[in-house]
A protein has these predicted regions:
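Ribonuclease/tRNase effector modules and their secretory precursors
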Residues: 1-124
Length: 124
């Protein structure tokens, strides 16, 4: 398990108002999942996970207590998406906010998400 950062809880209340912890982690199992399902992506996006969570461009609606976080890294044009599961008071107390998956996305996919998914948060 690796800690990525602490959330700005107010920013992420658009997913759920019930956020008892700030800590965001990614487990070794989830890292392996990303490597298996999106070969070559983890090594490219890992340095930007903290930035994406701290300063997302968009947070989109997903499953309950889960958001799709979109971030463009302007110095290299990388667009990344990550799936963030928010820990709520109904979850086991030892759980944390966690990155479920993450990968690079293309500009057409990015635009498709913005057209077809509900935008919960947009950076200014």
């Amino acid at each position: 398990m690796k800690k990525i950062c602490d959330l700005d809880v107010e920013k992420y209340r658009c997913i759920t108002p019930d956020i008892p912890t700030k800590e965001v982690i990614i487990t070794d199992e989830r890292i392996q999942h990303i490597k298996n399902h999106h070969p070559g992506h983890f090594e490219v996006i890992e340095p930007y996970l903290k930035t994406a969570l701290e300063a997302p461009d968009y947070i989109l609606e997903d499953a309950p207590n889960t958001g799709l976080v979109l971030k463009t890294i302007y110095e290299n044009g990388l667009r990344l998406q990550l799936v963030l599961r928010i820990h709520t008071s109904a979850d086991s107390p030892e759980f944390k906010n966690s990155v479920i998956s993450a990968w690079k996305i293309s500009e057409p996919r990015w635009n498709n998400y913005l057209r077809n998914k509900k935008i919960l948060y947009k950076s200014e």
